[in-house]
Swiss-Prot record:
Top-rank lineage group of the source organism: Bacteria
GO biological process, one term: translation
The protein, known as: Large ribosomal subunit protein bL25
Start and end residues of each stretch annotated as Disordered: 186-207
Pfam families xref list: Ribosomal_L25p (PF01386), Ribosomal_TL5_C (PF14693)
Function: This is one of the proteins that binds to the 5S RNA in the ribosome where it forms part of the central protuberance.
Biased composition, class Acidic residues, residue ranges: 196-207
Species this chain originates from: Methylobacillus flagellatus (strain ATCC 51484 / DSM 6875 / VKM B-1610 / KT)
Cellular component per GO, a single term: cytosolic large ribosomal subunit
Gene this chain is encoded by: rplY
Length: 207
């Protein structure tokens, strides 16, 4: 079920007006895109933050309700206070059912515990990317993408081109010939062979 966020049109603009909004517990924002003009908005911070803190809010089609009228949007940008971690400003972009959107989608890594590089070699998994930019129609937008590490060996990486995507979804980076590494498994320091040699040397010294 799509998340619905409520807003009202914002009359005052500029730094002073935005400060007054924040002091009153609200967040200045804007919605733009499509064949409509940009509209300045204000949101109740408490209500907005309850949804904002969830991962799905950042990578899904949202219902934006402004003065009773709903339209579909995606989160495009936001600013957080460096100390209080409150939302200072937020931007949304309108979407059309017939036009592709570019959205950063979270990567969920699975089966790391059974990867040969971990289970057999004792390697350590490193997540190089935690999200990736995808292109698709709004109806095909996934909330997250699974990255299966079950066959990954120590000393190797898994790249975008090796990840299975839902139908209709593609990685933007691959369209620009950038097959970025997503995760890797580093070999244990010294390696199993080195440990064996060390044990043998210790036994010889004891004799």
């Amino acid at each position: 079920m799509a998340i619905t966020i409520k807003a009202t049109k914002r009359e005052g603009k500029g730094t002073s007006a935005s400060r007054r909004l924040r002091r009153a517990g609200n967040v200045p924002g804007v919605v733009y895109g499509g064949d409509k003009e940009a509209v300045s908005l204000e949101f109740n911070h408490k209500e907005l933050f309850l949804e904002f803190r969830h991962e799905t809010f950042h990578a899904s089609i949202l219902n934006l309700e402004v003065d009773g009228q709903k339209e579909q949007v995606v989160l495009r940008d936001y600013q957080l206070h460096p100390v209080r971690n409150t939302i200072q400003h937020i931007d949304f972009q309108r979407v059309s059912a017939s036009e592709k959107v570019h959205v950063k989608v979270p990567l969920h890594f699975i089966n790391a515990d059974i990867a040969p590089g971990v289970k057999l070699a004792g390697g350590i998994v490193t997540h190089i990317l935690t999200e990736a930019d995808v292109s698709c129609l709004p109806k095909d937008l996934p909330e997250f993408i699974e990255v299966d590490l079950s066959n990954l060996e120590a000393g190797h990486s898994i790249h975008l081109s090796q990840i299975k995507l839902p139908n209709g979804v593609e990685f933007v980076q691959l369209a620009h010939d950038n097959d970025a590494a997503v995760a890797s498994i580093s070999k244990p320091r010294g390696g199993a062979g080195a440990e064996g040699e060390a044990d043998a040397e210790g036994e010889a010294a004891a004799e």
